[in-house]
Amino acid sequence: MHSIRILSALIILISPFYLNAQVQQTRTIFYGGESREFLIYVPSIYNPSTPTPLMFNFHGGGGNGMGMMLSTNDMRPIADTANFIAVYPSGSGGAWMHKAPTTYNDIYFVEAIIDDLASEFNIDNDRVYACGYSEGGIFSYELACRLSNRIAAVASVSGSMMTDTYRTNDYGFPACSPSHPTAVMFIPGTIDMNPHSMYSGLLPYYMSASDISNYWKNHNNTAQSPIIVSVPNTNTSDGSTVDRKTWENGDNCVSVVELKVNNGDHDWPGTFGNMDIDASQEIWNFVSKHDINGLINCNSTSTSNYNRLDKKNLVKVVDPLGRHYNLQRNNIQFLLYDNGLVEKRIILN
């Protein structure tokens, strides 16, 4: 498959060489007989001499890349400090999953985007990640299944995984066959009644949350039983809580993580629905630990360190009422980390 970039609509550009400039572009490539759009965000700290990760974000059915960024999963503030390029493609007709026979094969559209960006930016090809909401989450699983030679790790929010029977018989896709151990995070809601994201699944079409964890823990050869940690219920008004379930010690040190939103609906936690976690930050904290070869700096003789208390990433800061805010002096604040640890802190002048 070949891509020809025919348009780059520049929204913000300070330097033509992308040095010390925030860049947000809507770009277009000619693919599959039509012009296809995707949005990119390049943080000001991007350095052309440093290989930089890509983070794909896929919208839900009926959406588009801009809407995904503005109303669901805005990863720009995270990219500004973590230094990755955020990519928001738009699906044809607002969809990612097209049944055979069809001229749309968005798996290779994504590959065309990777190649297009790699021709202009210094992309770390070992650190290309994908996440999505609803149908975009389902599509992220498809990338892990069918483009695993380019995708290091994936995450899905409120989107299930298709069964192989449904994938092959109805869509004409090959069976899921990842080529390497793949770190996977998924964030389902237990009362989500959308057919393609029900916690209990919808056989023979979509897997349950248990089926998804079973598939990936078996593929990755992780521990069979998860470590379960209750996430602090910092927002008691959202009507939901979160349990973190981690299957550790997989091949190449990869893990599988489920952030189970008890009483959660078809939501993106941190934006709407549950507010105890920020799904965007959780996803980046998780996938960024991995490259195409597994956990970065993996030591195969030791256990995965994702849940060790000395290995933690700050998720958010809240006041005693659970409200988000930045670190402040002379106030009580609670620092929430991705391993379940909560620190109470007062910074004095």
Give the positions of each predicted feature.
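Bacterial Sec-dependent N-terminal signal peptides
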Residues: 1-23, 303-306
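Residue-level detector of functionally pivotal "anchor" positions at catalytic/ligand-binding pockets or at interdomain
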Residues: 292-324
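Alpha/beta-hydrolase-fold serine-hydrolase catalytic core, especially in secreted/extracellular enzymes
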Residues: 182, 217-303
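A domain-start/cap signature at the N-terminus of enzymes
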Residues: 19-54, 85, 102, 131-155, ...
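The conserved beta1-alpha1 loop
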Residues: 56-60, 158, 188-189, 262
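The feature captures the conserved acid-bearing segment of alpha/beta-hydrolase catalytic domains
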Residues: 152-153, 159-240, 246-251
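Serine-hydrolase catalytic machinery in alpha/beta-hydrolase-like enzymes
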Residues: 25-45, 49-129, 133, 139-142, ...
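C-terminal tail/sorting-segment detector
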Residues: 332-349
